[in-house]
Amino acid sequence: MGCSWRKTLSFFLVFVPIYLHGASSQEAAPVGPRKPFFERLRRLEEQFRRFQEVTWTHLQNIASNYNVSYNVDVRFRSLAEESQAVAQAVNRSQASVQGELAQLKAWVRKLQRRGRKVDTRLRALDLTLGERSQQRARERKAHKAQRDALQDSLARLEGLVHSQGARLAALEGRLPVAHPGTAALGPALVPTPTQPEELGPTSLKLQRDRQELRAASEHRGPPQDSSAPLQGRREPPASGSHRVLSGTAPKDPRQQAWSPQVPGEICGVGPTLVFPNASTRNVVFLSPGFVTALRALSFCSWVRTASGRLGTLLSYATEDNDNKLVLHGRDSLLPGSIHFVIGDPAFRELPLQLLLDGQWHHICVIWTSTQGRYWLHVDRRLVATGSRFREGYEIPPGGSLVLGQEQDSVGGGFDSSEAFVGSMSGLAIWDRALVPGEVANLAIGKEFPTGAILTLANAALAGGFVQGANCTCLERCP
């Protein structure tokens, strides 16, 4: 801008003198009249004024353009300064970012090293866990095989024990009818222990039991009538009877003093329940019922009935199944037969025709989920047995347990055709399978097995005509 202004000023200073010199030369010439000269001079003056105005306008434009260019230069300088500041800030930020990136790279390298260490540890842990899982799987297989073998051995042992118990019961039935003159036959029943090392544990136990039976037969005195019912030998409680269930089954056998009773009597068995008719109001609840799941069960009781059928002895119902555990008979069944139900619809039909003679009989129904084995004992004798009945099953807790009626719903839905008519006494339930020796001792009043979870002490009468009594001997009960 400064150069163009200087060029314009130089041109103006050169052009004006030349123009004035030409005008003066024309004025000095004598040619022509005087008047045209002044006119030319006026025109020239006007042209000069116009030129001056144009020049002034041009100079003003140049000045304004110079100011604009100056402002633009200032702006450019400010922009350059700002750009430099921005560049410096960018450089500083780039430097800080580079430093942070270097730190991040260092952290990443550290994390990678730690990750490799963790991966190594995880692989080692995975290998260790895999080996342990394989070892545990092998141990589980071995334990399962041992458990299966133990269950098989236990099942065989239970079968052997019950068979030996049946033989012992048969021997016990023969001993009371022997005459005094035949007492010498007692030793013949016991094998001579010439070679004890050849006898197994079961044979030794059988030998000891037979020796005990022989000693008992020597102190038993004169023979009695073999047709009489089984003799109870519990020490009777206080004399008299009443209609309140205040007595309890013996909890500890050591607290009971056993002594012989009159032949043909069953004494000291505890409370007695009498169901006089088939009314659906005749029901007894056992509380609190089963509080834990049962994988084995033993139900034993003295029973007397003369109605021609047994009816329902026991019924256990839950919300999802009203026949979780039932011992019941009805009009449509064969007289004396009873259905043993565990987890409806599975059941077994048990023969109990011996109970229809109007006399007291002792029954024990035993079941275990191991191979689903079950046994029925009547008056110490094994009358029915089987297996594969609800194998591995558990009777759930929390249901309603009643005597004398069959439940079609929890605590109700009774039917008179399935009601029990008769008497029960000495009822008890165990959460294990009693062995034949315990069943025999219970039937003859020798010893009450330990661990009973329910007895008639847990009974609660629910109205109706059921009578509760504590009889000195069963034959004296109503």
Swiss-Prot record:
Tissue: Widely expressed at low levels with highest levels in small intestine, testis and brain. Very low expression in endothelial cells, monocytes, neutrophils and lymphocytes. Isoform 1 is not expressed in small intestine.
Location (main, coarse): secreted
Swiss-Prot/TrEMBL keywords: Calcium, Disulfide bond, Glycoprotein, Metal-binding, Secreted, Signal
CC terms in the record's Gene Ontology section: extracellular region
PROSITE patterns to which the protein is assigned, alphabetical: PTX_2
Cofactor note: Binds 2 calcium ions per subunit.
Cofactor dependency: Ca(2+)
InterPro entries named among the record's database cross-references: ConA-like_dom_sf (IPR013320), Neuronal_Pentraxin_Related (IPR051360), Pentraxin-related (IPR001759)
Domain Pentraxin (PTX), residue spans: 269-473
Ranges of compositional bias, category Basic and acidic residues: 208-222
Residues that, per the record, bind Ca(2+) 1: D322, N323, E406, Q407, D408
Pfam families named among the record's database cross-references: Pentaxin (PF00354)
Signal peptide start-end: 1-25
Annotated compartments: Secreted
Intrachain disulfide bonds: C300-C364
CDD domains in alphabetical order: PTX (cd00152)
SUPFAM superfamilies in UniProt: Concanavalin A-like lectins/glucanases
Induction: Not induced by bacterial lipopolysaccharideS (LPS) or IL1/interleukin-1 in endothelium, monocytes or neutrophils. Not induced by PHA in lymphocytes.
GO molecular function: metal ion binding
Binding, Ca(2+) 2: E406, D408
Residues carrying sugar: N67, N91
Region of interest called Disordered, as start-end residue ranges on this chain: 208-262
Protein name: Pentraxin-4
Organism the protein comes from: Homo sapiens (Human)
Source organism phylogeny: Eukaryota, Metazoa, Chordata, Craniata, Vertebrata
